[in-house]
Amino acid sequence: MWYSIYCEDKKNSLDLRMKTRESHLEKLKLLLDQGRILIAGPCPAIDNEDPGEHGFTGSLIVAKFPSIQEAKEWAKNDPYYIAGVFESVTVKPFKKVFP
């Protein structure tokens, strides 16, 4: 089943986010290579794809997992979570309708 993983960043976490970015992307690439990512990316803090020093407010990942528990475990093992970038993480079942 698909699960949405919404991660809210801690304030002023941009430097930590950027230091941890490569390992975070490597973890996502494993899911991508397995065909398990529907969409993934950060949420800019301003209305611009490149927010610069304004940074990001969080991230959204919609990916396929065998269960919600496995989705939560995956999120807890994300390098951003481990490094302390995220204030909170919410995992919910997701039903794809379009496209």
Short names for language-model regions:
Residues 1-99:
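Conserved, structured core segments of small domains
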